[in-house]
């Protein structure tokens, strides 16, 4: 006969096994660059010229144009690097974009304003997102997609964001 303690322990282990980790592994070709097409709402992961994966996404609440100032709701345009990964993001997982660059800082300073910062590709705190543009300038994908992107993309990867 199985003791109550063994039954409870076994049930707990089965429950843990049923939970999937948000940390995935990836053993395919290296992602050498990311392309983001704001108007088409498509994020592409590439190995040299080969498309590995493409994802739809949501943007900031004012998506047209290049991010110029903190709080403008825009996503930057241009070339940047992935400069950090955040496994503790309040948006599931996130990878940081090296905005602002020197040109962004100079432009904002010329207008006496802050360029802002903390631009990320991230998941969503609400898995039932309504798919409207809702971020403050970040690029938002589903949590499942973010798990794939997080596993595939390394710090130092080039990201180019197009209008």
Report residues per predicted region.
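Well-ordered beta-strand positions in beta-sheet-rich domains
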Residues: 33, 54-56, 79, 118, ...
């Amino acid at each position: 006969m199985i003791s109550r303690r063994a039954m409870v322990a076994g049930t707990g282990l089965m429950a843990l096994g049923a939970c999937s980790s948000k940390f995935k592994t990836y053993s395919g070709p290296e992602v050498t660059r990311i392309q983001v097409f704001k108007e088409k709402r498509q994020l592409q992961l590439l190995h040299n010229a080969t498309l590995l994966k493409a994802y739809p996404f949501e943007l900031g609440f004012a998506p047209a144009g290049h991010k110029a100032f903190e709080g403008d709701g825009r996503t930057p345009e241009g070339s940047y690097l992935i400069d950090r990964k955040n496994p503790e993001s309040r948006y599931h997982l996130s990878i940081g974009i090296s905005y602002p660059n020197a040109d962004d800082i100079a432009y904002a300073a010329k207008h006496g304003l802050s360029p802002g910062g903390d631009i990320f590709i991230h998941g969503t705190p609400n898995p039932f997102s309504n798919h409207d543009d809702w971020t403050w300038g970040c690029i938002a994908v589903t949590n499942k997609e973010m798990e794939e992107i997080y596993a595939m993309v390394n710090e130092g990867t080039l990201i180019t964001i197009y209008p």
